[in-house]
Amino acid sequence: MLHTLHRSPWLTDFAALLRLLSEGDELLLLQDGVTAAVDGNRYLESLRNAPIKVYALNEDLIARGLTGQISNDIIPIDYTDFVRLTVKHTSQLAW
């Protein structure tokens, strides 16, 4: 399943998101959700421990001035890769 987090993790039921993640799921951080990718924040450690791959939309990282601040565990992607993820996952859940 593809999970997309478009809101700040501080304004989301992040605990519920973590509970619903399963091995093989993927999470895309976009819009204000990219703030979860910033190195040193409390949400990043939970994402590191989850059995998933985590991506962040590069355009949103740039727009928020975060490109130099994200964890190496987060995979920056462009819109083409975003489309590939949506094609790959028939089930999606937006947060």
Swiss-Prot record:
Pfam families from the UniProt entry: DsrH
Record has tRNA processing as a keyword: yes
Keyword terms: Cytoplasm, tRNA processing
InterPro entries tied to this protein: DsrEFH-like (IPR027396), Sulphur_relay_TusB (IPR023526), Sulphur_relay_TusB/DsrH (IPR007215)
Spans traversing the lipid bilayer: none
Subcellular location: Cytoplasm
Span of the signal peptide: none
Gene Ontology annotations for the cellular component aspect, listed alphabetically: sulfurtransferase complex
Gene Ontology BP, a term: tRNA wobble position uridine thiolation
Function: Part of a sulfur-relay system required for 2-thiolation of 5-methylaminomethyl-2-thiouridine (mnm(5)s(2)U) at tRNA wobble positions.
NCBIfam families recorded: PRK13510.1, sulf_tusB_dsrH
Similarity annotation: Belongs to the DsrH/TusB family.
Subunit comment: Heterohexamer, formed by a dimer of trimers. The hexameric TusBCD complex contains 2 copies each of TusB, TusC and TusD. The TusBCD complex interacts with TusE.
Protein name per Swiss-Prot or TrEMBL: Protein TusB
Lineage: Bacteria, Pseudomonadati, Pseudomonadota, Gammaproteobacteria, Enterobacterales
